[in-house]
Amino acid sequence: MILDAITRMFDRAFEKEWYETYWAFDLHGTIVKPTYNSKGDTEYYPYALDVLRILTKRPDIKLILWTSSFPEEIKDFLKEFELDKIHFDAVNENPGISSKAGNFGYYEQKFYFNVLFDDKAGFNPNVEWKQVYDYLVSCEVIKYLPDPNWTTKH
């Protein structure tokens, strides 16, 4: 399911000459395994860390952490992500999308993303992180992933 969304997004990004795409990630039950206690969730699902590290390195992919965690929990997770070499470009907001520009529509209250990783939206972290990892690695090998500077070549 998520691979279909990713491949369609890459195709559309190339077709529309988008210079950035926005990938949103839920935290609990998607990136980390929920523990349902006050100590916090700190165990990553297998391959989640690997995928997020690959995506963090791409300047054309903006990562959004989309979570209902409390502000102090978010700060703690962001510190943990930084130690794990993962960078989120935004937390619970739309990076780089302005309703004032008028070319994307009105996004002051609507969440904007191209790909959504969320267990509540059907993402199965026990299976799909590995699929996404394998896909991204195979794309790197055959150079399928778009060049971050591809728009300058047109």
Place the predicted regions along the sequence by residue.
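HAD-like aspartate-dependent phosphatase fold
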Residues: 1-154
